[in-house]
């Protein structure tokens, strides 16, 4: 049959039971061996023959017990490697798996994560960028032979909540001393094979993508991958619920969208402020400005663009803090200038009185003054007539 030239096929399909091809599980020939002329009457799970587009192919179809491994074949794809194409409302990219060392692939992923500043919400786009470069994961999928796979990306018109940039994805801080998050490594399985569970509900889609670790003093690179979000969701839910039960959540942490770089309010209140509440107010204004503009980068597709936006916001926040501190310093300087002016006027009046007293006093009266007062009165004597 003409199954070797399927259109927009992105999954390994199974052949009927009467297939007698001599191929092996990892056969490199793209065209399929000849099969019976008529349409196959059945599939391993009893469903009808799939259409040429591959939409009727059962995803969960498994061969009967005792079936040989040659029942699987490699489907040749008409698209080139890394070329995106539309499949319904999804944009798909097909990737061939190659022999790539797992340590080097892990180092590459760590390098990408480090270069993007610990972004975890863009894991899906990072995989797609790797797919466009022709790099695929070395870990085979369970139940499928080594062949072409595809990773799906939602269309740009309706971005899913899973692919959030780390600038606006921070939900709540769990309070000082309790924010410990362990980021699981990137998974090699596609997003559609995420195991369902109670921990993958709405709370898993609104996980914070960047957390501040108070105990360890570091930044945790945020959202777990889609296929292993179950454990991460349970951890984060426990950490977000425990402070609310004990009533120790700071009031500043109840915002739905907080900036990625977050200053703890307790540190601001505990630190000595020489200028009163001006510095704390400036920090709160900077945090609110970042919180308002943090969600603007949630649909940004480029990690570098989001990093540039974050740098610009940090610079704006620092300028705002600097301006508020300058206002406080100017007020203090004005107060000190007034005090210096008053002291100078009082000093001038005292010097004038001293000069008059010295001019009117007799030598006998000056001789009766204590010896300790002479050094103080000596320098001011020549200034008496001038005043």
UniProtKB/Swiss-Prot annotation:
Superkingdom of the organism of origin: Eukaryota
GO CC aspect terms: cytoplasm; dendrite; nucleus; synapse
Pfam families: TSC22
Region described as Leucine-zipper: spans on this chain: 336-357
UniProt-annotated stretches for the region Disordered: 1-85, 135-232, 368-387
UniProt key word Transcription: yes
Assembly and oligomerization: Forms a homodimer or heterodimer. Forms a heterodimer with TSC22D1 isoforms 1 and 2. Interacts with NRBP1.
Protein name: TSC22 domain family protein 4
Species assigned in the record: Rattus norvegicus (Rat)
